[in-house]
């Protein structure tokens, strides 16, 4: 007779969960941040709000964003005037867009990741799909399974309405799946489309305006598995440890509510302060077991909620400016793509490390951290181990 302990041992992988491929995708419509205030106030019929436009222009100028990608074009917005009004009932129109576009954009990223992985898609055993853009049944995970032609018995996990911390959540879940299911290959997809949050400006709800200045559309996909097949699968990063915590006294700091007018966005002014106040504790918990206390000696992948968060984290930890370079580069080129952002930064870092002739995928360093920040205020922490290039 075989014991339960023996069965469990046989079911578990030997090595740590490893990122084996990364793919990203964006809608073709590229928006320049410098001219966006003009476009935004014109398309929402708000050009008479001169002072508010000046405020929005300052928000865009301070955002450290040069460009973003958006599914919503001028043509689509003209066809859907209710989406352009502030808080006009428009959920049906928004849903009709995102239930199609979210899985479609996710597929584009997934196809790239599967191609880099180099294995047949029939070897995918699990699918994690994450989006804050719309809700449907069967979900975006089901739609993606159909679009990619995955096997019907792939084990699916659908994560809706998590927000900006969820790039860390999907990694945490993928790690547990890969390490506890020998031979598992997990396709992870985060796909975010701002059609649910776009709306005209309001004098009384400036935090909504912050969202209009920051958010962009994008999808990122990973293949995650333990014990890579030699000569076939090429490791990029290993995931060594994960955690999730709710920051104390942070209720209401970041909220989103699905209403007839779409997904509304609410933000307290002191979000950067709450994040920077709690980051030290998260780092100690993560890196004390590794005897690491110099946070300039690790590589950094932080969700770029906005430049103020990055500035305060740098200041609090006395980080050198180059530590956040990959994060700031992605923010500059794409804006805040919610859950997909940190996965874009992973991709940016491994590519830049190779281009610069560095020894590892993590800017030549061995250890690194990935942070997700979002509603709650929830903080996700992932300790990464780089791979030799």
UniProtKB/Swiss-Prot annotation:
Keywords: Acyltransferase, Flavonoid biosynthesis, Transferase. It is an enzyme of class 2 (transferase). Gene3D superfamilies: 3.40.47.10. GO terms for molecular function: naringenin-chalcone synthase activity. InterPro entries: Chalcone/stilbene_synt_C, Chalcone/stilbene_synt_N, Chalcone/stilbene_synthase_AS, Polyketide_synthase_type-III, Thiolase-like. Pfam families: Chal_sti_synt_C, Chal_sti_synt_N. It catalyses: (E)-4-coumaroyl-CoA + 3 malonyl-CoA + 3 H(+) = 2',4,4',6'-tetrahydroxychalcone + 3 CO2 + 4 CoA. The primary product of this enzyme is 4,2',4',6'-tetrahydroxychalcone (also termed naringenin-chalcone or chalcone) which can under specific conditions spontaneously isomerize into naringenin. This is Chalcone synthase 1. The lineage of its organism: Eukaryota, Viridiplantae, Streptophyta, Embryophyta, Tracheophyta.
